[in-house]
Design a protein with these regions (language model features):
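Alpha-carbonic anhydrase
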Residues: 2-267
Length: 267
């Protein structure tokens, strides 16, 4: 038991010790582009039918990890192991709105300077985007939506923070994004005179799950540090419906946890 606790403590203090691999580096370019499929030069993919998640690996050799990978995301956050994971810090800043419909989601690109700190490592926020319904499950159940904040460290390591979105009051932070979100795929749109505050989309209670996973879209590259907050943020039912009108389903099904540790803070 002592050895196991030591292992968990080490995993919490050094959650991502490996540098960015070449496949993950290439995948990052695809993830941050106007269209993941176009930016990577890879095969077209989607969420239903012959292009759906169960077929991703067959669409292109670049997508092999979608089936062959052993540390895939999302997962069911069923029972985290209590661990001294330490605090997570955010220094996000309001900024001009840059929004894009990349054909798979609505994405907000972020200017340099907004940071997330995990232990001694700083990760710069690159973009955040949305999934309907939520990709991660919480004890087998999916929230209405999920927001992913994608970060990169100076060494090139990726870290994503996930926030569940559940029906409730109008989310004021989402109003300018929803008002400007393009109805069709296209280039990034800089919305004059409109600012967005990523910090306003974070939950007040910062209890979280942590594990090593992957990108949730092709090429499903692994080596991504995931932090998913337990408590959701509210948005109005009409805000959910507005997003769902554009993306009725853009969530990958839960993947096996396998031999990974799922850690939970604050317990």
């Amino acid at each position: 038991m002592l050895a196991r606790r030591s292992l968990l403590r080490s995993a919490a203090l050094c959650p991502l010790c490996a540098p960015l691999t070449a496949p993950l580096g290439a995948a990052l370019g695809a993830t941050l582009g106007a269209s993941a499929a176009r930016a990577s030069g890879g095969a077209h993919w989607g969420y239903e039918g012959a292009d759906g998640p169960e077929h991703w690996a067959a669409l292109s050799p670049e997508y092999r990890a979608c089936t062959a990978g052993t540390e895939q995301t999302p997962i069911d956050l069923a029972a985290g192991i209590p661990a001294q994971t330490g605090r997570i810090g955010f220094a996000y800043h309001p900024q001009p709105l840059q929004v894009v419909n990349n054909g798979h989601t609505i994405q907000v690109n972020v200017a340099p300077g907004s940071m997330m700190a995990i232990g001694e490592t700083g990760y710069e926020l690159l973009q955040f985007h949305f999934h309907h319904p939520a990709e991660h499950l919480l004890a087998g159940k999916a929230a209405a939506m999920e927001c992913h904040f994608v970060h990169r460290s100076p060494a090139g390591a990726l870290a994503v923070a996930g926030v569940f979105l559940q029906p409730g009051r109008v989310n004021a932070a989402l109003v300018p994004i929803w008002k400007a979100m393009p109805v069709a795929a296209g280039p990034v749109q800089a919305v004059a005179g409109v600012t967005v505050d990523p910090a306003a989309l974070l939950p007040r209670d910062r209890t979280y799950f942590r594990y090593m996973g992957s990108l949730t879209t092709p090429p499903c590259s692994e080596g991504v540090l995931w932090t998913v907050f337990r408590d959701p943020v509210a948005l109005a039912p009409e805000q959910i419906r507005a997003f769902a009108a554009l993306f009725p389903m853009n969530a990958r099904p839960a993947q096996p946890l396998g031999r990974r540790f799922l850690l939970e803070s604050g317990v």
